[in-house]
Amino acid sequence: MKLSVLSVLLVSVAQAAAAPWRPREPRAAGSKRLTFNETVISAALSPSSISVQWIATENDGDYVYQEEDGSIKIESIVTNRSQTIVPAEKIPADAYSYWISPDLSAVLWATNYTKQYRHSFFADYYIQDVETLETVPLVEDMVGDIQYAEWSPSGDSIAFVRGNNLWTWSDGTVTAITKDGGPDMFHGVPDWIYEEEILGDRFALWFSPDSELLAFLTFNETGVPTFTVQYFMDNQEIAPPYPRELDIRYPKVSETNPTVKLNILQLSDNTVSTIPIDVFDPSELIVGEVAWVTDTHTELAVKAFNRVQDESKVVIVETASGETKIAHERDGTDGWLDNLLSISYVGPLALGSGDASSAYYVDLSDHSGWTHLYLFSTSGGDPIPLTEGEWEVTSIVSIDQERELVYYLSTQHHSTERHLYSVSYRTFEITPLVDDTVEAYWSVSFSAKAGYYILTYAGPSVPYQELYSVNQTAPLRTLTSNAALIEKLEEYALPNISYFELEIPSGEKLNVMQRLPVGFSPDKKYPVLFTPYGGPGAQEVSKRWQSLDFNAYIASDPELEYVTWTVDNRGTGYRGREFRSLVAKQLGKLEAEDQVYAAKQAAKLDWVDSEHIAIWGWSYGGYLTGKVLETDSGAFSLGLLTAPVSDWRLYDSMYTERYMKTLSTNAEGYNTTAIRHTDGFKNVEGGFLIQHGTGDDNVHFQNAAALGDTLIGNGVTPEKMQVQWFTDSDHSIRYNGGNVFLYRQLAQRLYKEKNRAKKEQHQWSKRSQDWVV
């Protein structure tokens, strides 16, 4: 018998109200309610965790960590002893981060930190001798202008980038490797778009395992259009007469992209060879991944994509000769191909059609319809599946060459969960390392030789961390228990979170996370806030520990008491390729339909105040909120749009064209996906709020400005529309207390919406849209 949607929701609520207590879950039997300061401003109610730098020594299981007093220590799992290598009083002033050399002889410090983009920053770098504790600058004349620095695996040299040029340091000698770096030429570091959309990091250089060679990418931005971001205050208390202007080479849809080249540096004599990756036209080529597939320096794998990222080719570079060959290729024109950055070298194996000399690597692919683990030979041939099924591998976490195992996390139990497994690439046997019959969200960090690991239970209850040996099933010890947090939370009455699946008319099932207010009673009426992100491949509904954040606050404040629903619509991640690809070439359409359908189902519940259902999203979620309002469905009474895209022509090419393809091939799609229809904005009962930072280098303020102009030009009235800019704030909206103001403003609008008793209608609202005089 098939339950109706309403029945499923009622069952879910009943289960949430009487859910069994999980170990380590606060019983929430107290009377205190979460406050704004506790959830938005303070991190006092957040779980603690430790992160370590595993190091390769004679004994596997050594790692480096930083004590609360700032001192740097090495701890050995085998001996259970720790040693201080840099005492707190010897830490350089204004230290931001550190990296110990592989030979443990020195520490590389980054100081004088200045944020650049999402991942990148500028800093000064110092080298500290572990034995003498003396510190010397990496470069004598540095002025907080070094972009990146990294130890070689041997620990006797450093590659670094300054002024967009690649340099090396060896025993105090600094050598310039490139000299033509500048505003349009980047060596060893990505430009803005490669950092944000392709590499997801601040470096584009890779030492070979034996430190003989260094592969690095060069990005040429000649011809890439410039977008200027203005900073009106520029970190000053009083505004300068003229704003500082930052010119960013930012290719938008169908504009010129940066070109990219692969180079290999011979570290012994500082000679550089450029390796042609000519599998696509240079103007179309995107290099998505570079990985050494060798224990020495013989072979390099380069994953290349075409411009719209629906074709990929893995090129193997024979470094001795410079010759290249296409080992594997993929057609993804039914949607797109994600750059998963997962190539991991395994070693020589005698498998399939290969011989004992064939080198193999593992990688993730969804060519079966679900993302799974495969063995690939550098000689080519069909990939060998290591996992299969209607679930997905989410990440490769370690390779154990000695035991011939790949460790990975997957959604085998449920798409909202993560469990840890190993698979033998010799026998193909899969072994769970955690109880995969119990709902949980795990993450893990393995030692250098994969003999030990730190296992992090990340939810749904309060997180903790334990240390394990791969040879034992019981933990060696607990690293963080968060016992104090559990005890503290016993003082509180907390919102109740539950999960369920909502079937939509097309037959797909959507994951939903529901948060019920403190003291929930089915005899009362509650307003609802939908909190989507909804972008391609993203996931918001997961069984991680749900931070006691703004959403928890609005479910706790007695003057708000909102139910929250987070719905992962079609196009989101970890549900298979078909589910993801449904949104290709039509962003915003199906996602909005799904949110509207879910809201209409929620409105049928007896305890939902159907006249007060709001929706709030940030970035893609802000865009989705706009598309939901555009439908003019009447399902939502308030829209809150934070840092939204409003027209995909205004966003960067590499993200947008991955899903929408080019403007010339999908002009109608771009017209449809832009937020241009205004009736829904005119008719939404409680109005809407648009928030955006003027210094947003990612989703430019231009998006909010253009949307605002469209709405005003089409007669949206002032009582419906509120716009808030945040001077100089980037996409995170944190500059000068902006984040606190932002959340206070959201809370104020939600309070106003909850108490809105009737339509707000000024006299001019009764006139035609030409009311402006």
UniProtKB/Swiss-Prot annotation:
Main location: secreted
Gene3D superfamilies: alpha/beta hydrolase (3.40.50.1820), Dipeptidylpeptidase IV, N-terminal domain (2.140.10.30)
Lineage: Eukaryota, Fungi, Dikarya, Ascomycota, Pezizomycotina
Top-level enzyme category: hydrolase
One Gene Ontology biological process: proteolysis
Name by which UniProt lists this protein: Probable dipeptidyl peptidase 4
Keyword DNA damage: no
Pfam families: DPPIV_N, Peptidase_S9
